[in-house]
Structures are given as structure tokens and as C-alpha cells.
Amino acid sequence: MSRQSTLYSFFPKSPALGDTKKAAAEASRQGAAASGASASRGGDAAWSEAEPGSRSAAVSASSPEAKDLNGGLRRASSSAQAVPPSSCDFSPGDLVWAKMEGYPWWPCLVYNHPFDGTFIRKKGKSVRVHVQFFDDSPTRGWVSKRMLKPYTGSKSKEAQKGGHFYSSKSEILRAMQRADEALSKDTAERLQLAVCDEPSEPEEEEETEVHEAYLSDKSEEDNYNESEEEAQPSVQGPRRSSRQVKKRRVISDSESDIGGSDVEFKPDTKQEGSSDDASSGVGDSDSEDLGTFGKGAPKRKRAMVAQGGLRRKSLKKETGSAKRATPILSETKSTLSAFSAPQNSESQTHVSGGGNDSSGPTVWYHETLEWLKPEKRRDEHRRRPDHPEFNPTTLYVPEEFLNSCTPGMRKWWQLKSQNFDLVIFYKVGKFYELYHMDAVIGVSELGLIFMKGNWAHSGFPEIAFGRFSDSLVQKGYKVARVEQTETPEMMEARCRKMAHVSKFDRVVRREICRIITKGTQTYSVLDGDPSENYSRYLLSLKEKEEETSGHTRVYGVCFVDTSLGKFFIGQFSDDRHCSRFRTLVAHYPPVQILFEKGNLSTETKTVLKGSLSSCLQEGLIPGSQFWDATKTLRTLLEGGYFTGNGDSSTVLPLVLKGMTSESDSVGLTPGEESELALSALGGIVFYLKKCLIDQELLSMANFEEYFPLDSDTVSTVKPGAVFTKASQRMVLDAVTLNNLEIFLNGTNGSTEGTLLERLDTCHTPFGKRLLKQWLCAPLCSPSAISDRLDAVEDLMAVPDKVTEVADLLKKLPDLERLLSKIHNVGSPLKSQNHPDSRAIMYEETTYSKKKIIDFLSALEGFKVMCKVSGLLEEVAGGFTSKTLKQVVTLQSKSPKGRFPDLTAELQRWDTAFDHEKARKTGLITPKAGFDSDYDQALADIRENEQSLLEYLDKQRSRLGCKSIVYWGIGRNRYQLEIPENFATRNLPEEYELKSTKKGCKRYWTKTIEKKLANLINAEERRDTSLKDCMRRLFCNFDKNHKDWQSAVECIAVLDVLLCLANYSQGGDGPMCRPEIVLPGEDTHPFLEFKGSRHPCITKTFFGDDFIPNDILIGCEEEAEEHGKAYCVLVTGPNMGGKSTLIRQAGLLAVMAQLGCYVPAEKCRLTPVDRVFTRLGASDRIMSGESTFFVELSETASILRHATAHSLVLVDELGRGTATFDGTAIANAVVKELAETIKCRTLFSTHYHSLVEDYSKSVCVRLGHMACMVENECEDPSQETITFLYKFIKGACPKSYGFNAARLANLPEEVIQKGHRKAREFERMNQSLQLFREVCLATEKPTINGEAIHRLLALINGL
């Protein structure tokens, strides 16, 4: 039986003493329950789950918990003034429709307040009327005059379907019956129905003022100065400082919900005026972003909680009189101070709102829990952090503590104990709440606002989830979205089926519906749009050291871009420096890494700690979390991930099937060379399963095997044979990508000044992603490179078409990601058992509209693609490039065409449903012929309706009465309404009387019952089809995924080719087509760039300052003078351009093999299989590697992996150690590169002794960056150095380091002292050299007398 309550039950706690206007502002987002819940039930629901049957929701004025509040709140409410009845259109005894914020219109009775003796109050310009709500347990309250309408009966037009007051809710229908009964009575009799005459709760009066203030603030006619809502200076002590800035405090909840009131919100999409203006805990700066939040937002109901307590107390005492409620003023101040907002976020973080009046900072409640303190914390198995198997993602919560919690809070702690590493967004009604330590994160990272109370608590509305969750995820947090997965009605039904129901059962179910991390973002309609176009990978890694040697290892890897649903899986051996693994993470940069605990070697840990320190890294427990290969295969087969394509059997994708043992036809035995790869996949599958996105991603069956780029690079193969393979790619490792600044610059880590920025003019996101992959792995096959260059020239030859195509491509959305989204929405697996399918979403209509908008955007995008294909197909006959012809030619018109013919399919979708109606309503109603289930249901409905009409005609003829008609609604339809004069005659025995009215009787027959049952069944099937219509339509669209994906791939290739063509014809200065020569027996590796320029500097620095240079290595014309020298020693003055020249050579080689024109007058080269770089000087602090160690590590990689076809770029090797050590190492490296490996090398150095050593070598050629020296003398301050930036033959005599010192503004005396010291070193070096020559000369038959004289002269000069 419903218990009696007051309107106070609907609203949260009241404001501080003397601050009623601030209360009006703060209450704007407080409390509402489900639309359509009755007024009394709305108040009771706040406590029903926590303590069923208790009356603790309405805190009695005599209880200790309420005693401190009553007096203060009565004083606050005294500001409301009684006004003459003439100011109101209603009088006591009138029946009205009344609407309170967040509730539907409700039948009410106007009557005088039981103690004030008036039914009207005025606050500012607003007028309120006292009413009693008709309900099982009548309740009363003050309602705005503007929210009252005359009640004219349940049969009135406005109360019927389509009317303003119509409702199908049973509570309202019962209230209307009571109001109809009252309508037939006179005023005196009606007033006797006013039975709710208990002493008024003080909070009721104050909270009604809050409600009215909110409404009046929204009204133009009742608008008053906003400054009245500003928080006023406090008179209660230092804790209550005034707020200086005018702002509305937007609050979502009070500690009552934290305490587990567990108020549930049941969305009602039919409710008018519901929106999201109330933003829980969201700062004012965010309020404009929540643009869809308008006035009339349903407010969440709040119940009062005992101050500072964890559990509600059941309060039995009733208030005897208003006098008994008078409190002690000091106690009131102390209690009400709990409701004041701290002045700044810093104080919010430390000062509790528990009513403590002390001036010093206190701590949040969760910080006082002993078992939660770091020194006492344990995991779920009670293991301490120093235990080797400690699990930091779980938390031990004592059972006695859980038992002391209210049901809502108990559920939160249970979820938190299993997911301690997550920030939990806990759904309460239409808001996501953050509690305890999560709330502290929300305030510090998101700018939310703490709620009042000694429990840390903040929140925000549902519609803002995407923005706030993404903000936390980008900062490295992991977010769990917890949704309500049953309504209160469903909970009640569940409890009725249980034999024994505890208070913990009487709480609606909540489940984790999604865990979001950096590596698992899918950008669903809740998550929002991606912030960048490039892929972000989740990488799983398993390692095994080779038994034969401790210096090599084998990696199993699996990585996935969750926004696309594309998996890469592979297994490869690697060296002790993890070279291949470093290259992988450079080409596919992960944002999150999974690995098996205890599995990684020291070298791999060094890579993770150094190069990948910014990634989230998570160790998984072997076996239970990081699965072995066998468990992975079994899970994939038993999970049914790869069914749904018309075949009920589960078949592994070809890539995975190829990794199983050939002897096992079932596919449960891993292949010998794939165990680690499949185990790495197991780690990924486990994590995706944990994040609840395994079904939507794996069901796409989009797998690709990963092979290291240098797999085919073997130095022993026949010269040039490897380059005939179209699959062969140039290897650019992580060091090279960084040193050449291909993707990110070394200054601030952005793309400014990089090759990617220079080239990237792609119009589509998927084109940008493809360009990046092409840059990671340029081609090596001369024929493939030439075909791309042909495509560039073909496009340059049709500028008009290119302009039209470019304009069309700009209109395309990210179709690659949209296809993944559509697949996820249409997934039948997800719709069957995923928690999201049970979630109660307040903004469901908004999300449906977003899904439809995405879908229609995809359809429009594919139409644009067809136009693009058609435009270029007109001129495709003149194209020489095979690739370009393939991507623009329809498969239906040419066997070599790759672009699918989408015309028929797109026309089918144009007629599938009303696009504009679906866009506006968020609902899809399929047209005839598109959805067989829906069509069959409609056909059955028409058939049964026609059958019933025919039966009516038969009964009319049978009884000889043409006035017989059908009557009834719902399941009581199709009653034969027969005039009474006919009904009195002998009727057939099968006629069963159902109802009567004056003048006629109504009958059913067995035939009607049977036909109606068939009709109802057909209608239910229709409704079920409509409910699941969007998913099934998306699933239908996804059946042609291969065609859609092929179209995207073709347009992506076209977009990148257009990008290359755009650069090729728009470069600053001369541009040339590279000539790639296949090496053979008579053609040795060479590189010839004439008049070449740096591709990026011309964009960064405009003008004619950049000097073009010739770079020749191994060319015939050079061989005539100096022999075939593959190594060029580059010298020159500091800041003379040596490093720029070296980077320029590497970038031009990359661009040439990418298939792009290069900024040069001439470009010829044999394919480069790999570019190595040793540039710059920096240490790796995180890896514990010094500057010199980094130099030697990079050099070791060069010597270990370089082949005769490689391009090696070394800049000042040896500078990180002692001069003689550095010189010796540099000398040895040059010798190895020039004489043993014989690869194309540019080696810059300031070691002039190195130049002298190789000045006569036929394997090494000398070159330097020219400069002009004026006033060269002993005094460096008198010299003037002019850099010519021209690369010419020969060696530079000096490095002119003191010129660089002067340009850097070193003190002159320091430069002079340094110069004198340098002269001393030079003389000593010359002396030692001459002495060595003398000593060598003594071994010869004749003595070099000239050398002796020079030595003596030098010694005398010292």
C-alpha cells in the first residue's frame, strides 16, 4: 500500500539560511523521476529501493536529522507572501490540471493550506497556488499559477488521445477517475476531499520556492534581475565566502543519491519540453556547449539524508505542531553550512561539506576508510601491493562495509572493487554521477563541481558523456559507463518472482555497458566524433627468446584500430636491439600496449620504457587474461564471432585459418610458426571482451597478416631480383622517420615542417591514412613506381576533371569509420546479449537521429563516390597508369576495374524508407518490399481486418440488422454492438455478452476472439519489426560490406594520387619525374640528384635563399675522375648546411620511390631498399642510454642490416665521446661502409684527420659545403665567414667553429682563449705527425732532410 508523503519528497535538500535566492539558482537541476510517475510515487521512489516500506523519505520535523533544518527553513520560507485571492483565476474547491517540473499534467484540487489558511502565495512576480494531487496517497504542494489549467473531465477533447493532457499511465488514469467523481460534486463536498492536512514540511515550502524561481527565471513575463540569484555573502563564518562572479550553480545531485537512494529515471519520449538545461556539476563555461538543454528539463528527485551518515535512519515520529519544529539557531547554521559551495576548486578538493565549521581543511569520507588507505590496501584476493601476483585493477572491500551501505552505493562499491583502475560514470536517472575518488578526478580534470556533503560527488547530464569521457581518455584515464538496465516496473516484476526479497534486491539493475580506453575508442553515437584522422592502435605483444642464442628473440604481435575494426597479426624474429619491433611501432604507433606479465625481456622493457613511455601499458595475467594460442582459437570458434553471413557454421577468416595446423581441419590447433601471434591475438580478444566491444569488432572478420618490411631483403640474392617484386617496400625504421622528420618534427613534436605536412593535401580522412602508410613504406619495384608516376601525369593532364573531383571529395565524410559504425549498430550479436541492448537511455531519440544521420551521410557519400568514378571514367581511356584505370573503372564494365557498381544498391536504399522523416523523428519505417518481416506483418493485419469486416457483414445479414457495428479499443475491440430491440430477440448461442450501454448490447463470438487474436499477433509482430527495424536495416546494408569497402579503398588511392599530383605540379621551383633504374650485373647502385632542393624548407622559408645542390653517389661521371666511390665524406663549416644536405638526400629518395615528382632538375637512382640515419645528438633518459650509446646503437643497426642497395646517412659520428675515441670509431665505420658493404653513404664529419686518411682512397670521395672567408688571420674576431650552402668537391680545410661561437654571442675573451688553445692543439698535432714521419723515414735507405728541418723549425716556434 502506498504510504503518505508530502511534496518535499520530490525535491532535494534546501538552501542555507537566509540564502533563498541562491537556492532558486542551485535547484535548477535538482531531482526528477520518470515521466508519468505519480506525484506521490515520485516522492516515495527516492527511498523505496533503499528501505522498502519505510517512511524515511519524509523526514519528520521532530527527528534529530530534521531538527536542525526546520527552523532555518521556516525562516527562509517566510519571505513568501500571501496575496489576495483576486490575483488568481482559481478558488478553493476548483479542479485543475497541474504540472510540476519533470512530471506530466496531473488532476488536482485547489484548497487552503492547512496552517496558513491561504491557497495563494507570491514570490517576486510569481504566484503559486496550493493544491492536492489526486492519488492513492494524496499529496499536496505549491504549483505555479502558469502551470494550472481548468479540469473539465476525462472525456474532454484535451484529455483524449492527441490532447494536451492525454496520458496512458495507469496512475494518471486513476487520478482522472477520482477527479471525475469530484467534478460531479459541489464545492463544499469537494473541499471535504482535502484530507492531506498534516503539518507542512518546511522543506516543502522552500523547495516550492526553488521550483517557482526556476520557472520564473525561464519566463519573459516573470523575469527578474539575475543578480537576485547570485549567492549572497554569508554571515556564518569563514567557510561561507561570497561568490564574486554572477553564475548559476548547476548541480545534479546531493549526497542522498550517494547514500543509495537509487532514484530511477524512466525516460518518456512523449513528454513535452524535456531537455537538458540542468547540468550536474558542470561549470558555467560548459553550459553553452550543452546547447540542447532547454527549459523544462526533468529534474531528479532527491530525498533527505542524515547529515554525515552513511545509512538512512527510519524515522517514525510525526510532527505534532509547527512549534515543535523550532531549532536552535547555532545548530541550524552548522547544519546549513553543509549546503554552501566552496569558493574555488582547491578548497573543494580538500574541504568536506559535512557541516564542519572548523577553519582548517578536512578530508573526504573515502579518505578516512582504513582499508582504502595506500598502506592498507589489498586486491580482491587480499594480496598486498608487494605481493608478486597483486592485481592493481581490483580492490578488497570488507563485507561488513558493503552491508552497511544502501543498495545503490553497495552496487557502486561492488563495481569499483572489480574495476579499481577505471573512472566509473554511474548512471542515476538522466545523469552520470562520479563518486568518491572518481569525483575528485572529475573535478580536477573536467572542471565539474562538487556536490554538497562530506562524500566527494560530482556529475553531468547524459548528453555530455561523449565530451567528458573523451577528455578523460585523452588524459590517460580509463572510463567505465554504467547504465540502468531495467526500469522500476521491471524491478518490481523481478522481485515478485523471488521467494525472499532483501533491500539489496529492490534496486534497479545496473551494468557496465562499455569500458573506454585510449586504444579501444570506437566513436559510437555516445562517444562523439574522433579528434584526428589517423589511426590509433591497441597493440598486444608476446615474446620468446630463441633457444639457440640469447641475442635473438621471436615476437608475436597483434594490433587493431578499433575505430575501423581492422586487425593485423604476425610473428617474426628480431635481433637483440629489437630493430623490427621498433620499426613496427613507428609505422603503426600504438596508444595502448598489452603484454603478458613476466614474459618480456630486458631489451623489450627498455623499448617500452623509452620509445613508448607515453603509451598506456597494461600487463595481463598469463592464461586467464593473456590466453595461449589454443584457448584463443577455441574462444573464437565457440563465441560465434564469424557467423551471420548466411551460414550457421563458424569458419575462421582465411588469415587465421592459415595460422592453424594443416593436420587439424577443425582449426583448434595452432601452427608451429604462429603460436605467439595467436596468443597475442588472445590478449587482444580478452581485452576487447572486457571492454565489451569484442562482438562488434571481431564479427567484421577484417584480418591482415603482418610481415616485417625487411623480410625479403637478403644481401645474397641476385642483384636487383628482389626489386622485381611489387610487394617489396623501402624500410624506414623509427630512427629514420624521426631523423628525417617525415611525420613529426624534432622541435615541438608537431607536423609543422615535416614531409607529411608538405605532401598532405588529401581531401578525405581515409585518404590521409593511406598517404601515411605509403610514406611509411615507399615502393621498391621500378615498374610499380613508374605506374604511380604515370598516374600523377595522367591526373596533371586533366586539370578540369581534377578540380571537379577535388570539390566532390571534400564533401565525403569518413566513410571507412562510418562503415564500422553501421556494422556495430547492425550487429545481431550485440543486439541479443550486450548490456547496451538493455540500457535505459534518456536521450534515445537523439542517439537514433545521430545513427540515421550517419547512415544517410554514408549513402550520400557513396553517391558522391559514384559521381567521382563517372567523371574520371570518361577520360580513363587516355590514362597510361594501370592503377588509376583500375580505381576509376567499374567492375561491371571491365574485368580489370575495381570500383564496384553501386548504382542499383543506392537506388534500393533511396526507396527503402522516408529519409527526411527518419532524420527528423529518429524512427525508420520501411517501405513495402524492403523488410520481409514487416511486410508480412502488415499483410497479416490487412488480411485479419478484412476477415473481420466480412464477418461483420455476415452477422448483419444473419440478424437482419444493418446497424450492427464493431465497438471497443485495444484487446476489447471488435465487440458486436447490437441495438437493444434486436438484442432482445433470439441470438445465436455463440454470442457472448461483453458489455452494455443504454440502447444497445455488445457481444463477442469465438470466431471474433480467434480472428482478434490473430490480428493482435500480427500487430505485435509489426511493432517488434519496427522496434528492431533500424538494426536490421543497418545489418542489411552491412551485408554488402565488401563492395562498400572496395569503393572506399579505390577512392582512397585516388585521393592520394591527387595529392601527389597536386604537389608535383605546385612545387616551388623546378620539379622532375624520378627515373628508377633496376640494378643488374652491369648497373651498380647509384644516386644522382642534380639541382635538388629540400622539399620542406622551401615551404617553411619562402624566397630564393635556398641554394640547389647536386648530390652524386656512385655515378658514372664521378667514376671517370675518382673511381666508383660509394661513400662521400662531407665536411664544411659549422652551420654550413651539412645536416640539411644529408636530410635532403634521404627525403628525395623517399619521395622518388613514393611515386612523386621531386624538387630537382634531374633525379636518377637505383632502388633503395632501406634508408639508415645517424643524425643529431640526444640521449634517452627514460631508457638509461647516454648520448654516445645512442650514437653507437644506431651505428650498430646500420652495420648489421645495411646492404649494397641501402642509403646510409651519418652526421658527425663520434662527437659524444673523447676526440681520439670518436675519431677511431668514425674511421672504422667509414672503412666498413666504403670497403665491405659498399652502400651509398653520405658521412659528414669535423674530424679532419679522417679526411686526410681517406683523401687518396678510391672507395671514398670528398665533398664539402662551400663558404667564403674574408680577412682570414690569426685573430678569429677579424674573420668574416659567408656560407654559400653549395656542395662542391674536395675537403674543407677548417670547420670555423669560432665563427659559430661568435654568432652564438659567446664572450669575446672566451673565444680568444679558445682560439689560442686550438692553435696549441694544432701545433702539437702537427709535431706528432712530423715526428711520426721522421721515425718512419729512418727505416728507409734515405733520410728526408726537409722533414727534419721543418720539425726543428716548428719546435723552435713552440
UniProtKB/Swiss-Prot annotation:
GO terms for molecular function: ADP binding; ATP binding; ATP-dependent DNA damage sensor activity; chromatin binding; damaged DNA binding; DNA binding; enzyme binding; four-way junction DNA binding. Residues 263-273 have a biased composition (Basic and acidic residues). One of its GO terms (cellular component) is nucleoplasm. Phosphorylated by PRKCZ, which may prevent MutS alpha degradation by the ubiquitin-proteasome pathway. Residues 92-154 form the PWWP domain. Keywords: Acetylation, ATP-binding, Chromosome, DNA damage, DNA repair, DNA-binding, Nucleotide-binding, Nucleus, Phosphoprotein. Belongs to the DNA mismatch repair MutS family. This is DNA mismatch repair protein Msh6. It comes from Mus musculus (Mouse). The lineage of its organism: Eukaryota, Metazoa, Chordata, Craniata, Vertebrata.
